[in-house]
Amino acid sequence: HEECVIVPLSSQNISVTTNHGEFHLQGREGVFAAVTDWLYLPNGSSASLVADSGEVAVCTARAQSDFPACYTPAQNVPVEVRGGGKASRQVTNIATPDSFKGARKINVCEVITPGGNWSSWPPHRHDGIDGCIATNEEIYYFRIGREESLHGDPVGLGTFHVYTIDGSVDESVTVKDGDAYLVPQGYHGPTIAPPE
């Protein structure tokens, strides 16, 4: 029993055929180019995707509740700026509890961190907190731009930190474009983008 959110990352003109009907996603050239439209599919859905090219994220979560299939156009996706100063970042709330009533188990957002800024600050966790209504595992999927330079490496990178209260996990890792990092427990943050 898994629900699904389909998010174009660097793909356009996507046809999605499901047991709930046909859907068309406009998509975008890349994650830094624009906010994108997206599609939610409930438990028990089947789908096939056809696109001209590029990447599409298929995000899933185990769920007991059923919500109807739902297409959301890009102009209806809420975008906010969180934090301030060097901890400011743009958050695109795709399928979050505040933006989508079906987000009971699945929670999908994009965070764009300007060069030199910190995200996931202050560090936070979604497990073992008294009174917290959610226990979330997270998957961070990193897309990082390139900076052409005569003397430097054009491949972008960032830093990501996770740790647990008991110290069983305490890692700071270098992340590059296309890396994924699983956070099943504990604090995560900061994520640091190098200066532009």
Where are the language model's segments positioned?
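Glycine- and acidic-residue-biased ligand/ion/polar-headgroup-sensing regions
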Residues: 2-23, 54, 115-116, 127-180, ...
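Short helix/loop capping segments that flank catalytic or ligand/cofactor-binding pockets
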Residues: 16, 49-51, 67-68, 121, ...
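Conserved hydrophobic/aromatic beta-strand scaffold that supports enzyme active sites
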Residues: 38-40, 58, 108-112, 120, ...
